[in-house]
Amino acid sequence: MTANRALAAPVSTGTGAYRSGAAWATGRGAVAGALAMVCVGGSVAVTGTLAKAPVYTAEGLRYAAACLLLLAFARVCGRPVRLPRAAEWLWLSGIAATGLVVFNVALADGARDAEPAVFGVAVASVPALLAVAGPLLERSRPAPRTVLAAVVLTCGAALVQGLGRCNAAGYGWAAVVFGCEAAFTLLAVPVLGRHGAVGVSVHTTWIAAVVFAVLGAVREGPAAVARLSAADWLATGYLAVGVTAVAFVRWYTCVGRLGAGRAGLLTGIAPIAATLTGVLLSGPAPRPMVWAGIAVVIAGLALGIRNGEGPSTL
C-alpha cells in the first residue's frame, strides 16, 4: 500500500483515483464485515434455544449443512475451491480446531463457570490483539490509530455487555474463548490469498463437521440426532445459513479487503446487534450504560475504519 501511494503521488489524478479506489474497497469490506457481525450478534437469542439440546451433534449438523451450502454457492458462482497444499492444511485445520471446535466447546462447557457476559467481554477484547498481530502477519507495522480504536471499542463493548460473574475456571474458559476468536481471523491471513473467502469457509466447515460428528458420537451417543426437537432443527438451520455460510464468507471477505487489524474493529457491532435484537424480541429496553457503550463503540469504529492511516510495510 505504501509503495502504491508513492507511485501515485507525482500525478494528482492518479492519487485521486487511488484514494477513490481505496475508499471504495474499504467501504465494501466494512459493509461485508458489518453484515457478518449483525448475523452473529442477532443469533444470540437463537443459540439459547439449543441450551438443552445435544450441542455437539447439533454443531456437527450445522457445519455439515453450511459446507454443502457453500459448495453449492461456489459452483453456481464459478468460485474455485482448491485443494490445500502442504502447510495450508495446518492453517485451515487450525482455524477449524480453534475458531470453530474449541471455541464452541469452551462456550458450552464454560457456561457452568461463567455468565455469558464474561465470554462477551473476552470476544470484545480480541480487536486489540488483531490490531497488533494482524498487520504483523501481513508483514506490515500496526497502525497506531487502529490500535487506539480497538481499545476504545473494547471499552464500549464491555459497557454494552456488562462484566458478568465467574469463578477461577470461568476465567480460564474466557481466555480460551479469547484465543480461539483471535485465531479464527489470524490463521486465515496466510491462506486467504489463494483460497479466498469461500474456499477458506468450505474447508474449515467440513473439517469442523467431521470433528463435531466424532465428539457427538462419543459424548452424546450415535442416536443423539433423534433427540433434537423441531425448535432445535430450526435453530441449527438458522445457524448453518446465517451465522456460518453467510457470515463466514462476509467476514473473510472483509479481512481480505481491510486486513485483519481494521476488520477486527467490526466485531464491536456484534454486541450491539445482540442488544437491539433482544429489544425487538420484546426484551427490556437498554439501560443508559448500554447506550453509552453503543456510543463508544460507534466512536471507535469511526476512528479506526475510515480510510486514511493504514499499516506501513515492514
Regions of interest found by a model, annotated:
Residues 38, 70, 93, 125, ...:
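Hydrophobic transmembrane alpha-helices of multi-pass small-molecule transport proteins
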Residues 33, 37, 61, 118-126, ...:
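Helix-helix packing/entry segments at the starts of transmembrane helices
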Residues 2-19, 63, 220, 232-234, ...:
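C-terminal-most transmembrane helix of multi-pass membrane proteins
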Residues 1-61, 66, 105, 109, ...:
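Glycine-/small-residue-enriched transmembrane alpha-helix faces in small-molecule transporters
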